[in-house]
């Protein structure tokens, strides 16, 4: 199977919970209808998934061409390239949908990125603990 059930559940739960958090938080903070902030969250998630596939495809080609090892500097370069490209794609979307300037949208996007970093850490930690407690053989089974 190309994508394991475990990875699919992980991805859907990660994106679903994040979407709810973003929609509610942006709606509350900016006094915007949840339809707007929820739609923005969906658009950003879709862009992120496609950008992830495109960016990683080409990054791995460069990595292979120059025989890069996945060292910390290469990981930092990867993270900066990925997040930088994502910012370029999402800032205009945020500015348009939230009816704000590009500068304000950039600041909001940086803030969202930092919040998502914290969310990702918490989600991963919780997911690992839940999986270990209720599905102790899931990781090993997905490796086969």
UniProtKB/Swiss-Prot annotation:
What switches on expression, per the entry, is described as: Transcriptionally regulated by the AceR regulator. Strongly induced by the short-chain diamines cadaverine and putrescine. Only moderately induced by the triamine spermidine and weakly induced by the tetraamine spermine. Expression is also induced by more than 10-fold in response to chlorhexidine exposure.
Recorded topology in the membrane: Multi-pass membrane protein
- Top-rank taxon of the source lineage equals Bacteria
Write out the GO MF terms. Answer: antiporter activity
Query: Phenotype upon knockout?
Result: Inactivation of the gene results in at least 8-fold reduction in tolerance to cadaverine and putrescine but no change in tolerance to spermidine or spermine. Deletion mutant also shows decreased chlorhexidine resistance.
Name the major location: membrane
> Which keywords belong to this entry?
Antiport, Cell inner membrane, Cell membrane, Membrane, Stress response, Transmembrane, Transmembrane helix, Transport
Cellular compartments annotated: Cell inner membrane
Q: How is its activity regulated?
A: Protonation/deprotonation of Glu-15 may play an important role in transporter function. Cadaverin transport is inhibited in the presence of CCCP.
Task: Tell me where the transmembrane regions lie.
Answer: 9-29, 35-55, 76-96, 103-123
Give a Gene Ontology cellular component term annotated to this protein. Answer: plasma membrane
Function comment: Mediates the efflux of short-chain diamines when energized by an electrochemical gradient. Recognizes specifically the short-chain diamines cadaverine and putrescine as substrates, and promotes the active transport of these substrates in exchange for a cation. Protons are probably the primary source of energy for transport, however it was not possible to conclude with complete certainty that protons, rather than alternative cations such as Na(+) ions, are exchanged for substrates by AceI.
Note the subunit structure.
Answer: Exists in a monomer-homodimer equilibrium. The dimer is probably the functional form of the protein, and the assembly of the dimer is mediated by binding of chlorhexidine and promoted by high pH conditions.
Q: Which family does it belong to?
A: Belongs to the proteobacterial antimicrobial compound efflux (PACE) (TC 2.A.117) family.
Give the protein name, as stated in the record: Short-chain diamines transporter
Give the species this sequence originates from.
Answer: Acinetobacter baumannii (strain ATCC 17978 / DSM 105126 / CIP 53.77 / LMG 1025 / NCDC KC755 / 5377)
Q: Which gene is transcribed and translated to give this protein? A: aceI
């Amino acid at each position: 199977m190309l994508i394991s059930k475990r990875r699919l559940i992980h991805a859907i739960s990660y994106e679903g919970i994040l979407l709810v958090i973003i929609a509610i938080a942006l709606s509350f903070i900016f006094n915007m209808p949840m339809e707007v902030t929820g739609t923005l969250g969906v658009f950003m998630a879709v862009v992120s998934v496609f950008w992830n596939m495109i960016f990683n495809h080409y990054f791995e080609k460069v990595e292979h061409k120059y025989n890069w090892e996945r060292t910390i500097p290469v990981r930092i370069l990867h993270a900066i390239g990925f997040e930088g490209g994502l910012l370029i794609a999402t800032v205009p979307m945020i500015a348009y949908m939230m009816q704000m300037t590009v500068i304000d949208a950039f600041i909001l996007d940086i803030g969202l990125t930092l919040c998502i970093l914290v969310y990702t850490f918490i989600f991963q930690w919780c997911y690992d603990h839940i999986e270990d407690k209720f599905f102790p053989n899931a990781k090993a089974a997905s490796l086969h």
